[in-house]
C-alpha cells in the first residue's frame, strides 16, 4: 500500500513539474509569438539558446548570457525597432574559455540562420556583467556595444560561494586562481574602445557600484554613459521608461 501511494505521489509530482515547466516556457514565448515574432528555443553547445526575430529584422541584435525574460523592457523596445534578441544560458558558468567558445558558436548560429550581425550588443545584468566584460575583452571585434546593468565586474568582491565556484571552473580550464583573482584589474582595458552604458542602483547592497564598475580606470573610454538611480537597490534593473538606454544602443557608431 505504501509503495502504491509513493508511486502515485511521484507520478503526480512529475506531472506537476512538467506542467509548471511548460507554463514557464510558454509564459515568456507566447506574447512574442502572438505579435508575429519568430521564436526559437534550442540547444547550442549543450546550453539553452533562445532567439526572437521580428518579421522585418534589420540584422542588429542584443543578447544576454543569463536571466531569460527578466527586466526585458530594453529588449522589447529594440524588437519594435527591428532588432532581434538572443540568449545563451550561461547562468552558472563564469566566463571560462569553454563558455566563451559556446557564446561565439551561438553568435555564429544567429548570423548563419537569421542573418544577424557578427557584432552583438551584450546585455549584462548582474552576474551577466562578468561574462559580458570578459567576452568583450577577449572578442572585441564581435561586440558592438555593452549594456551593463548593476554589473558584477569583480568576482573577488562577490559572495564566497560564487568566488569558489568560479575559481574551480577557471582552474579546471588551466587558468590559475591567482590570474582569476586579478583578472578584473588587469584585463578590462581593451573594452574602453567599445561604447558602454552602465545603469546601477545607488543603494545596491548586492553588487555595490563603488566596489565593482566604479573601481575601473575610466579614462580613455571611447563612449561611456553611466546612470545611477538614487535610492534604488539591486532590483529593478533597467529604467522606466527605458528610452535613454534604447537611444544609446540604437545610435550609430562612427568609426
What are these regions (language model features)?
Residues 210-255:
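C-terminal catalytic histidine-bearing segment of alpha/beta-hydrolase fold enzymes
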Residues 58-67:
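Short beta-strand element of the alpha/beta-hydrolase
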